[in-house]
Amino acid sequence: MAPAGRSDSDGGTLSPGHLVTLSPVKVGMLTFLGSEAAFFGTLIMAYVYFLRQTTQEEPNPSQVFRLPMILAASACLFSSSATIHVAEKALRRKSQEAFLGWWGLTIVLGLLFLLGTGLEWKNLIGRWGLTISRNLFGTTYFTLVGFHALHVTIGVIVMSIVFGLARSRQITAGNVTGVEVVSWYWHFVDGVWVVVFTFVYVVGR
């Protein structure tokens, strides 16, 4: 049992009664993720609403999506939630090499997701002529999926920076707050994709 008022290794403080007070970094990340959840919720509602107005105008969702490609890319992203969790646990166990391995795999899976998204867009634009200005479907689809891809890209960049810092031993088991908040962000990005995938590729078709 830790003494009251002692700082923990996660960037919080154990206050009297053992309540955890989050660090400013964690509070900031939670606030950011809350605002991003509202942002994506608005985009998803806009996609569903406008899609109902434009389903008869070609090209439309029932024609253009290639589910095998989308499923493969999605599997990579969903798997990355597991690998980043394992990486964080490895760092807490002071297993730096295991952390680097699992964290690096998470980056690769994120890149594979982006590759799959790029190939899907190539198909939509090249074969079907679907662009963000083509019709309401194109506008709402590329806005929603594009912003998600942007968030994945940002996540991959930040994780790559963390990987470099960890290799140079600037991130260790005694300093896991940065890794933890990046993990929160990545789990959020994965969670958003579950909802986006459901509405765009399942319900929307």
Show where each model-derived region lies.
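...captures the hydrophobic TM-helix bundle architecture rather than a specific catalytic motif
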Residues: 1-205
